[in-house]
């Protein structure tokens, strides 16, 4: 690939830790047309879609990379099924309401995964001395200044392999394992976009931006699952009530909303989009063929984050007005369909559960 147009110390480069959103909007308004004009000069024979198809044919994964991801995806699916069987039995033994019996394994699995991968991502971004892309986002392009393809960090290779496998598993899980929700179709699309983003950024060696995307997302997912698990576990069919789960759930929900705004909306815009939609144009390779597609995917993910924040804001508003527990308002409203309140539904589900013969 052709080296960057500027180096990071050039006086015309706007370099900061966290970009001002208004300033960033003006920079992006200039950087995107600049990239297309420059690319037209570099590849005057480019025509859409034939040239893009030709570019896609030039990239591929090695057999070892592909098999590693597929094996990991299979392992994730096996572990998810195993955990589901074990925890559904556990929910019966611990008097969890039947309507939560399938939700507990799903949330516990996601909490385990997202918590683990985010801790590893935190280690990479905050504890590895070779770079500091979180506090200096434009520095993710420094290694391109030599003119060659930068060497990929082993931590990033681990992140990409594990996350790619998880999204392949998640496509299957959304269709066949997870509770279907109002936004499941959007989640399904999200998984494909995430896979496409991982693949294209990997073959273009834009892996540091990709690692930052994942770092800014997984902590809110983990906090959401803590919130959901707390409310699933606080009240039991034997009329026991665990107040500490209630308190933990409320605290986790508040933390979840704060993390979403800071990480997925503010820092995603002012660090990640600043470093990619603006920084990559001037500091990354000039002839990266998939830059427009990668940029579009990043913007789509941001739009999804804004859309999902709609659910969070509605939940906060409902809790503030009614004092009810923050429940997942993406789920299909069983109460409205049946005409029964949740307490009556729980009583009927519990009665039905008690009529079932117990396994010896």
From Swiss-Prot:
One GO cellular component assignment for this chain's record is:
membrane
Q: In which pathway does it act?
A: Lipid metabolism; sphingolipid metabolism
Q: Output the superkingdom of the source species.
A: Eukaryota
Q: Where does the record place the TLC domain?
A: 117-321
- Where located? Membrane
Function comment = Catalyzes the acylation of sphingoid bases to form ceramides, which are key players in cell signaling events such as extending lifespan and enhancing stress resistance. C.elegans contains specific sphingoid bases, which are unique or different in structure compared to the sphingoid bases found in other animals. Two examples of these distinctive compounds are: 15-methylhexadecasphinganine and 15-methylhexadecasphing-4-enine.
What name is this protein filed under? Probable ceramide synthase lagr-1
**The organism of origin for this protein:** Caenorhabditis elegans
Its ancestry begins with:
Eukaryota, Metazoa, Ecdysozoa, Nematoda, Chromadorea
> Quick one: which gene encodes this?
lagr-1
């Amino acid at each position: 690939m052709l080296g960057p147009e500027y180096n990071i110390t050039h006086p015309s480069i706007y370099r900061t830790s966290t970009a001002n959103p208004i300033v960033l909007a003006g920079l992006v308004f200039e950087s995107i047309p600049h990239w297309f004009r420059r690319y037209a000069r570099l590849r005057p024979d480019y025509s859409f879609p034939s040239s893009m198809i030709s570019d896609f044919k030039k990239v591929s994964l090695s057999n070892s990379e592909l098999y590693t991801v597929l094996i990991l995806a299979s392992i994730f699916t096996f572990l998810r099924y195993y955990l589901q069987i074990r925890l559904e039995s556990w929910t019966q033994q611990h008097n969890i309401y039947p309507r939560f019996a399938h939700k507990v394994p799903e949330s516990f699995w996601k909490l385990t995964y997202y918590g683990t991968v985010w801790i590893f991502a935190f280690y990479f971004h905050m504890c590895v001395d070779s770079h500091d892309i979180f506090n200096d986002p434009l520095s993710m392009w420094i290694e391109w200044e030599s003119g060659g393809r930068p060497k990929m960090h082993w931590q990033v290779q681990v992140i990409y392999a594990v996350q790619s496998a998880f999204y392949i598993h998640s496509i299957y899980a959304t269709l066949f394992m997870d509770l279907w929700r109002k936004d499941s179709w959007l989640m399904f699309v999200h998984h494909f976009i995430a896979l496409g983003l991982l693949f294209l950024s990997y073959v273009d060696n834009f892996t540091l931006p990709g690692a930052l995307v994942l770092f800014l997302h997984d902590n809110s997912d983990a906090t959401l699952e803590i919130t959901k698990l707390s409310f699933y576990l606080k009240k039991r069919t034997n009329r026991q009530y665990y107040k500490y789960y209630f308190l933990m759930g409320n605290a986790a929900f508040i933390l979840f909303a704060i993390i979403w705004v800071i990480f997925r909306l503010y820092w995603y815009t002012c660090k990640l989009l600043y470093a990619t939609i603006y920084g990559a144009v001037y500091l990354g390779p000039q002839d990266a063929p998939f830059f427009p597609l990668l940029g579009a995917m990043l913007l789509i993910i941001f739009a999804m984050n804004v859309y999902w924040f709609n659910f969070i804001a509605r939940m906060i508003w409902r809790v503030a007005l009614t004092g009810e527990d923050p429940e997942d308002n993406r789920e299909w409203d069983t109460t409205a369909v049946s005409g029964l309140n949740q307490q009556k539904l729980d009583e009927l589900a519990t009665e039905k559960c008690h009529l079932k013969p117990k396994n010896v």
